[in-house]
Amino acid sequence: MEEFQGYLELDRYQQHDFLYPLIFREYIYALAHDHGLNRSILLDNVGYDTKYSLLIIKRLISRMYQQNHLIISANDSNQNKFFGYNKNLYSQMMSEGFAVIVEIPFSRRLVSSLEATEIVKSYNLRSIHSIFPFLEDKFPHLNYVSDVLIPYPIHLEILVQTLRYWVKDPSSLHLLRLFLHEYSNWNSLITPKKIIFSKSNPRLFLLLYNSHVCEYESILLFLRNQSSHLRLTSSGIFFERIHFYEKKKDPVEEVFVNDFPAAILWFFKDPFMHYVRYQGKSILSSKDTPLLMNKWKYYLVNLWQCHSYVWSQPGRIYINQLSKHSLDFLGYFSSMRPNLSVVRGQMLENSFIMDNAMKKLDTLVPIIPLIGSLAKVKFCNALGHPISKSTWADSSDFDIIDRFLHICRNLSHYYSGSSRKKSLYRIKYILRLSCVKTLARKHKSTVRTFLKRLGYKIIGRILYGRRTDSFFNLPKSFLYFEEVL
């Protein structure tokens, strides 16, 4: 075991100072609340702002200590789920600034990994009449797949212990423990850790989650190298991220980011095994026999139990055949279906028929998750019935139509490579009818009255995307709508 000790250090020689004095700088809190600012100023321009505001931090700390934690108001119990009560707003402000600071080591590693692998920054992941190339290249050759939800640590102190290998500044870790202890159920084993990670200061907990995942995946890579003499085709580490390089703030982001986060990790590939992390799941796939998949399943279980102190049952990790199981990946339900074809051949006087079976990638639009996403942002109800977008009713006709059109176009571009587009047509119909209902609400009329007054031809244009010849007599906003299309 001693000969492996150097490898198990897990790049801990790359420890970084936390730059603890950054907590006293004002622009840190501006970065914490305005994600549109360019965070590279922390990496490239160290001397961007040398202005310290000790007075602000002293006030925050003093107010934290002046809080009487013995006085609990029942009315405040639902105000702030991370710090329990609304009176801990000062602690939350400091924790958000602290989260920006501790992202610096991870941001440096992310930038260096992108430069080393020469990965091009992609601002728009779109599938225009095709699917993603690696799905077409890899899926037809795979037989078995297993998607396992990565368990959260049973105690948050494990995350702090993991993070201390990345940094040298112990005072920062003590401050981190202070923030974590502010959570009322910090030591509770009953509270689901997934709720803590998803709803309570997601930036800070995502950072801790990244440190936890990077350590366990480094050990997983070590196990792979020790169990196989074949060289890896490729390997690399990406981080789960909330904010990517730059994104326009529009309604389609609300639909996709909340339910289809594009945080992907293609950790390693060898001739027989593929590993990818997506949406907090470890996805293992193989074109070999199930024996190899079973071996890796027990690798994962033992690693979680021995390293992260998380109890996991191997019997609850299923190995599925791609021909009988759909994999939720990149917003598609992907599976392999046999494509049977009959070939008739003739040799001299003898004729024969051959059945030729080929694998074909089948990609489906996930209709139920998409309807759930649209229901969250109030485009429809839980059953998929379109409703008006009340928050947009105060906008101009052109803005309302343009917003709905933008969402429909993005959905069409992304899912145009799907094998079956019936679900996509239903989603587009929900959005277009929601657009009509929003316009009717804006003009304070019923949908039927609005349709009669406007004309069925232009409504058909909105609902079904057909060109019309009667748009010359329409209001100016609808002329803009035709120009946009």
Swiss-Prot record:
GO-annotated molecular function: RNA binding
Subcellular locations according to the entry: Plastid, Chloroplast
Main subcellular localisation: plastid
Top-level taxon of origin: Eukaryota
Keywords assigned by UniProt, alphabetized: Chloroplast, mRNA processing, Plastid, RNA-binding, tRNA processing
Keyword flag tRNA processing: yes
Disulfide partners: none
Gene Ontology CC, one term: chloroplast
InterPro entries: Domain_X, Maturase_MatK, Maturase_MatK_N
Keyword presence, DNA repair: no
Example of a GO biological process term: RNA splicing
Family to which this protein belongs: Belongs to the intron maturase 2 family. MatK subfamily.
Role this protein plays: Usually encoded in the trnK tRNA gene intron. Probably assists in splicing its own and other chloroplast group II introns.
Protein name: Maturase K
Protein source organism: Malus domestica (Apple)
